[in-house]
Amino acid sequence: MSLEPLDPPTSSNPRVRQVEAILHGTVIDHIPGHMTLKVANLLARENDQVSIGMNLRSARMGRKGVVKISGRELDARTLSRLALIAPSASVSIIRDTKVVQKFIVPMPKLFEDIARCANPNCVTNHERWTSRMEVINADPLTVCCIYCERNFPATELVLL
Amino acid sequence: MAFLATALPSAPVQFTGRHVVSISDFSRNDLIHVLELATRMESSQSPARLDGKLMATLFFEPSTRTRLSFEAAMHKLGGKVIGFSDAGSTSTKKGESLADTIRMVERYADVIVMRHPRDGAARLASEISTVPVINGGDGGNQHPSQTFLDLYTIAKLFPELLSGERELTIAFAGDLRYGRTVHSLLTALCHFKVRLLLVAPRGLEMPDQYLHAAVKAGLVVQEIPTLQEVVAQSDILYMTRLQEERFPDPLEFDHIKHSYRITAAMLVGAPPHLRILHPLPRVNEIAVDVDATPHAHYFAQAGNGIPVRQALLSLVMGAV
């Protein structure tokens, strides 16, 4: 298996995997612990086989979550949605158990039709119109609705 | 006007066909360009005419000054006006979307002036319309033509605003959280050398995003506890209306409203050059006895809406 271990190897148990490996699909790692179920909910379709690891030990984050989806690679829209709720997560594409691509979730400049504006009086919540939010700060992730011009932390947004 | 001589030379500015949605869309040069043209409009030195042009006023919310002054400005330029001032009498009542209303009106008129209760409605309209959209107020968000006239008023009173020869002290008082005029004016003032004093009841303070923008732009910003303290040290006192519905407890509103009311007695000993502005309508926050003092400038400010809106209409329709 060429997948990277989720935990730093230790001398007593160098390659312990805390969430079952997958043959083909996508692994989302380094998810902030409290966002793990949200990420799984966001990514999983009805018939997907999903493995979830919560509160796993992480050298970088202390505790983290991992979500593995078998048989599917993420499209651009799903990656944008992931960027909004878990901007520090890493994504590995798995084919025949091998990591063929690994990257940090790309942060778009603009979130388009990804989340509902948190301002209840924003026109996009009342007209049939696409929501558009510009990223104005990466950490903590903060966006500005280009319609109502209000700034929001990403944590206040509801995904569409 | 004196302030023109002190304004920095502005680069060529392209306005034809442009929407006026948010003051954030305008550079310092743009702002000065509009003020310069408004000055020429006021002194009848501009040849701009809009004969044969039609302005549609879509007022989904009530308005007195904005609608009347846009209409007056259009008539003065030789143009004509169509529109409504009550959304209840339009197809909106039947469920027509804003987008569809705009797609129709853009075929009737050469420019659209719009007020709408939803934040961001003007931006949405501008993405659809092929004719310029001028935002006459979108919910609690923006009211750029008011900001242009506020800036014009301040620059007429204090040419130093544009020349930068002296740092002006401008105080905002009242509801700074929900008041769109103070948000827009603060955004515009970020282009100039200004010290800002803020006086607001607890819970109605200026939102952080505007404070951060002001500080980032290099403005000195201070929160001051009482109105009386800013009277003694300001060039401009910009009052806004406190709205009772913002206060969960009516008793608290009753108490607060007296603390944010300026009276003639409070102006005894104020610097002679202090001028009080207000976007109007005022309710209780400026006592009627202030009107007779030399500090009252809010009606003159409202009058400045005509040349400023003449300038905006002429610019976006390419008449100058």
Residue ranges and their predicted role:
Chain A
Residues 1-12, 150-160:
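N-terminal charge/polar-biased segments
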